């Protein structure tokens, strides 16, 4: 199976933001796998959350990004798997803590709630922050 740096998907309401994010990440020479959707026709977000989750569980990509209107439904759908730690992040601090303290492996963005002026900063912080381990590992073991 081919491996990727990042797997990404959105529902119809996140399609435009997803397209911008893919362009941004490709400029950074990252290998992106786009699981859809490919237009703004109405689709069901759980189907796209499952695609990203399955790819991460299969270890074909270490990080995922999911986008819907608020991100709440995507968060619920993605977090149904015990191997997934999906975090809804609408600011830089939340993205940093999601990785540093919770070892999040999926970044969830709300297309209607995230500030487009900082969305790339949020993504960069999520991608570059390392898990701190230590007491955070102990806490994570309690929720597996």
UniProtKB/Swiss-Prot annotation:
Recorded hits in InterPro entries, A to Z, give: RpiB (IPR004785), RpiB_LacA_LacB (IPR003500), RpiB_LacA_LacB_sf (IPR036569)
Q: Does the keyword Isomerase apply?
A: yes
State the protein's name: Putative sugar phosphate isomerase RP299
Entry's Gene Ontology BP terms:
D-allose catabolic process; pentose-phosphate shunt, non-oxidative branch
What's its EC?
Answer: 5.3.1.-
Lineage top rank: taxon: Bacteria
What protein family does this chain belong to?
Answer: Belongs to the LacAB/RpiB family.
Residues annotated as the enzyme's active site:
101 (proton donor)
Q: Which GO terms describe its molecular function?
A: ribose-5-phosphate isomerase activity
**Keywords attached to this entry:** Isomerase
Q: Does the keyword Isomerase apply?
A: yes
Please list the residues that bind substrate.
Answer: 12, 135
SUPFAM superfamilies, A to Z:
Ribose/Galactose isomerase RpiB/AlsB (SSF89623)
């Amino acid at each position: 199976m081919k491996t990727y740096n990042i797997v990404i998907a959105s529902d119809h309401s996140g399609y435009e933001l997803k397209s911008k994010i893919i362009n941004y990440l490709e400029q950074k020479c990252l290998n992106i796998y786009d699981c859809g959707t490919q237009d703004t026709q109405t689709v069901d977000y759980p189907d796209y959350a499952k695609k990203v989750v399955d790819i991460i569980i299969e270890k074909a990509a270490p990080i995922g990004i999911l986008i819907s209107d608020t991100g709440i439904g995507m968060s619920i759908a993605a977090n149904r798997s015990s191997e997934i730690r999906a975090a809804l992040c609408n600011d830089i601090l939340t993205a940093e803590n999601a990785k540093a303290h919770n070892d999040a492996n999926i970044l969830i963005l709300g297309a209607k709630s995230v500030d487009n002026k900082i969305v790339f900063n949020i993504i960069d912080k999520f991608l570059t922050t390392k898990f701190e381990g230590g007491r955070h590992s102990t806490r994570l073991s309690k929720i597996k």
